[in-house]
Amino acid sequence: MRQVMNAIPDDLLITAPDEVRIRQDLVLTALGHRPADRSLRVGRLLDVHSRTWSEDQEIVIKGRRIAWVGPAGSYPGEVRERVHRPDVAAVPGFGEVHKHIESSHLTPEWEAALVLPHGNTWTCEASHEFSNVNGARNLEFWFEARRRGSPLKIFPQPGSAVPPTAYEWGGGWYGRDEQARFMAESLMVTGLDEVMDWPAVWNPDNPSYKRLWGMIEATFAARGVVEGHASGLRDLPSINAFAAAGLASDHEVQTPEETWDKLTRGLFVELRVYAMDEIVRWLLAKGLQDWSQIAFTTDDRSASHTLELGASDHNARLAIEAGLAPEIAIQCLTINPARHMRLTPFVGSLAPGRFGDVVLLSDVGKLTIAEVWADGVQISEGERYIGQVPEIVWPDWATKTVNIKRSIKPQDFELRAEPGRATMKAAVIRPFHWHPEFYTLELPVRDGAVQRDESEAITKFAIVDRFSGDGRIAKMFWRGCGPRTPETAVACSVAHDKHNIWVVGSSDAAMAKAVNALIELQGGWALVREGELVATVRFEVGGLMSCRSAQALDAEMQALYAEGRKVDWMYEPTYRPRWYPGFPERLMFATLTCAPWSWVLVAPCEQAPLGFINVQTGEAHPVIW
């Protein structure tokens, strides 16, 4: 039978019309009526659908897709190139079910170069970081590297937390109409990013209630997935209510019992490393047989930590060390997340029609990666990336996002006392202050301003608006963080999830100097020690990421850490287990406003002019009185 050879569409981005033509060609290639580009013959192959191994198998590839899988030598058609790897086991490319690429602090093309050698060939991008900086350009940003040829497939989920609460402003705003457009625009949009504002889900009086349910409705209408975030929700009424809302998953589980209660109410559980060993051992002892509702996630892993630990392959190794069968761990990286995100036609298994994403293991039990293939070609050898990194000059809409049209001055951080007062009462919170009430302390007044109290580990913390152009500042006193070293401050433009600038310091002058350095950098880190700017790290894309290799970024971060070790940092334990002594890097996450936070500091805006607000109730309060 004579077949007309038509040009096959480029399937870097998935569209329905192109998908039809690609699959028409794959049908004929599988039947042997059209030639295949290459075959990859392996010692054995894991079918993740049945969790079974087959010996001496061949994966036949056409374009970027798998056309045929079966016993070596039995493919009926012509193959232009043959590759034989007899000593390795083939498993599907690993998928990140829930990841904020922004937290690697690398742009997508450099993220690809970092994670692909770890087997991570596709990522569901939980996009409420960049979308809170430039919501209008969100999909364009996430598709650009792929459009330019990057092998990493990114499936964006527009953020439900844009803004995170009704009391924050700037950078982006998403509601029902925006989500409906996103879902209609691309088959690669899988749904709605983690719903974090739990009070806005259950309380009809919450000012975000209508916006959030509108986004959920738009996602349901397109048969998308609504991802959840159930931090702190451990009682059965709350878990049942969360599941009843249609929120499909949780990646915040901390205990085995919480994990079980959520699994048995139908939630898809995405395990991070923090409690993985305990949870996996407990579930095995419990006798869990069906692990299909479980996947592994790195969530907010930085480039430095990925260089040190690995990507989701590290999570899987921890699970295997805890006693999980390697084949089940691989399912938790492949078919489980693909099914959950409804992406099985494209990724998640070594089967016809899927992208040619293959991880070749030299040791299955240790999950030792020999090679990674993506889009049907080899892109890594051991830990070395050998694929393409597109050269992208990111435009101003991505690189000019710190919009502060003035110089910040020390007096901007003063908290002026009432005339004649020797002391003032102050509202005080701590990093990760999950308590429903703030502390009240009496603080001294000097030169008309309320002062820090080092003896009580009280310092000053501020949020600087970077979107309006005015550089509006909310400031208050925090406990148990920040520098004791005089004239010292650290500032950062990564402030989850609205990503204004946060700064903490032992003097107002040092705080101003650090923030002004970030304005000039267009985002990143700035450390001022004893009045001198001693270290900066550049996050020039969105104030969140940098367009360079992980190794180059890590070198700059290590220099920051080295200078940070010369500072005497205050520290007190808090509610969150991952709050550590020393350089306060995790203050990036102490600005979160989702559940279980109550009292928080946000940049001043119309919805929260004082900046200090209870996001559970909407109550505002002065920071001094």
UniProtKB/Swiss-Prot annotation:
InterPro entries recorded: Adenine_deam (IPR006679), Adenine_deam_C (IPR026912), Amidohydro-rel (IPR006680), Metal-dep_hydrolase_composite (IPR011059), Metal_Hydrolase (IPR032466)
**A GO molecular function held by the record:** adenine deaminase activity
Q: Which UniProt keywords apply?
A: Hydrolase, Manganese
* Gene3D superfamilies per the UniProt record, alphabetical: Metal-dependent hydrolases, Urease, subunit C, domain 1
Provide one Gene Ontology biological process annotation: adenine catabolic process
Which prosthetic group or cofactor does it need?
Answer: Mn(2+)
Matches recorded under SUPFAM superfamilies: Composite domain of metallo-dependent hydrolases, Metallo-dependent hydrolases
Q: Which reaction does it catalyse?
A: adenine + H2O + H(+) = hypoxanthine + NH4(+)
Name the family the entry cites: Belongs to the metallo-dependent hydrolases superfamily. Adenine deaminase family.
Question: What protein name does the entry list?
Answer: Adenine deaminase 2
Q: Which gene codes for it? A: ade2
